């Protein structure tokens, strides 16, 4: 997919992919409005600074799951231990479509991830 914008990326997805990826994008927009997503590495990504090494969260769609990517491998390892229904990929957690419980668990830990990078934003949670 050669999307130039987040809305274009979402428009290129099938209905199931679009529903789940859009839900995560909506969550990030509602809880962390100061983080603006952009397309990087062909997926919607929220940079915590100006460069990727300063931290990022991203989302991507695959055939049977969607992935939420994190720049911190140790955080991802801890997170995946509590998500037995999900597989861990390279710097990402793969959530099967329809697994709302795992998605909500990941969303609940986004603020913990942001604290690793001393991100000065605050969630409305």
Language-model features and meaning:
Residues 1-125:
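Charge-dense, helix-prone N-terminal extensions
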């Amino acid at each position: 997919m050669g999307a130039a914008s987040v809305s274009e990326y979402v428009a290129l997805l099938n209905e199931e992919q679009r529903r789940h990826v859009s839900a995560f994008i909506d969550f990030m927009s509602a809880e962390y409005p100061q983080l603006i997503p952009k397309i990087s590495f062909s997926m919607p990504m929220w940079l915590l600074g100006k460069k990727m090494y300063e931290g990022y969260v991203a989302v991507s769609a695959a055939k049977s799951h969607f992935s939420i990517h994190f720049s911190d491998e140790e955080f991802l390892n801890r997170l995946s231990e509590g998500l037995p229904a999900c597989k861990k990929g390279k710097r990402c957690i793969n959530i099967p479509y329809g697994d709302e419980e795992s998605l909500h668990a990941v969303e609940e830990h986004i603020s913990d991830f942001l604290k690793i990078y001393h991100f000065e934003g605050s969630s409305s949670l």
